[in-house]
Amino acid sequence: MKNKELSVLVLICIINSLGFGIIVPLLYSYGKRFGINHETIGLLTAAFSIAQFFATPVLGSMSDRFGRKPLLAISLFGTCLSFLMFAFAQGVIMLFAARILDGLTGGNVSVAQAMISDTSTSKDRAKKFGILSSAFGFGFVIGPAVGGLLSKISPQMPFYFAAVIALIGALCSVFFLKETRIKEENTSLVQAKRFSFSSLITTLKMPVVGTAIFIGFLLTMAQFTMIIGFQTFSVDNLKLNNANIGLLYTGFAATGIVMQLCVPFFTRIISSKAMILLLSTAACFVAMFYTGFTGVVITFSVGMVIYGLFNGIRNPMLNAIIADNNTSNRQGEVMGVNQSYASIGQTLGPITAGLVTMFSIHGVFFLSAFYILIAFLLTFRLTSKCKS
């Protein structure tokens, strides 16, 4: 992928993540107007992830057959419509319908990852995945602050703005993004590349890829468990308003970008991607365990910053490991399966977090630390597999 083409993809990813960054920190406070509480915010978050679980591997496989560009555009148009549904919502049912629609068309991340896999080599893959992850992260940095400010105009304004942003991203993908799948490959693989849900199982049996996907599932579950704790702890314990929540979330996301941009530096010092993942996962565990003991804004922020820093390395390393150990004609499908299992983590994390908040909000952070600990132990296995 040439620098110009990569720049276009990065711009689209920034635009896409900006919309999500605007609304995600506001879901709980906005949903409370319709009766959303500690338990149901987990279900609302999970609705998106369940729909995405079924959709992303199919969309990824379709991108292998028909090309990345049309599937990316469809995903972004679906996101635009879902944000509009949120803005016009009159009750809880519409909120859930909007999240489900966004999940069903939520193949943008896996398709973008497949585009990087198409056009990179093992040598520069981690670097390009780091750039892509930082692009998504950059939108999350700006988004919460923008959403917090727009919410002062009206509760619906952040969702209108996010819809416009998603529409711009879709139009950019249609008019400015070049296809990365070779036409001859698409034509010859239309019949051979039909997706089967058995891939959700067979992919896990791939020696390195399966372990990496499961580690990603655990770390995603930990992150989305933390997000529920972040939202409820910020509102109910720290008593922060929407603007301050947005700024705090912005700081958390910014730390991840710093590390993602440093991926080339880390890969020069440590050649093993699995070893980098191992060390960063250990740091995430320590940070999350510490956060469970915090009670004021300053100490809570310290824990989030440390976690955000080292969690930022996760996706570039895991995605590079998966792409390195995958065949070129299955990049979209396998990245879709990877995103599908991440969706399970996005589902189970909020649900278990919602149950734990019934007893202790601090317990959510300890639960997240437990998931990270399991992932850390599995990363030892991944490291040995990569060496062999």
Q: What is each residue range found by the language model?
A:
Residues 1-3, 178-213:
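Juxtamembrane intracellular "pre-TM" segments in multi-pass secondary transporters
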Residues 25-39, 228-244:
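Short amphipathic helix-loop junctions that connect adjacent transmembrane helices
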Residues 98-138:
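Cytoplasmic helix-loop-helix junction between adjacent transmembrane helices
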Residues 70-85, 275-289:
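Structural signature of the two symmetry-related core transmembrane helices
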Residues 35, 67, 88-93, 293-295:
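Helix-breaking motifs and short loop linkers at transmembrane-helix boundaries and internal kinks
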Residues 56-67, 259-272, 357:
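Helix-to-loop junctions at the C-terminal end of transmembrane segments
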Residues 49-57, 107, 140-141, 253-261, ...:
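Residue-level signature of mid-helix packing/kink "hotspots" within the transmembrane helices
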Residues 131-175:
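Helix-loop-helix hairpin linking two adjacent transmembrane segments in secondary transporters
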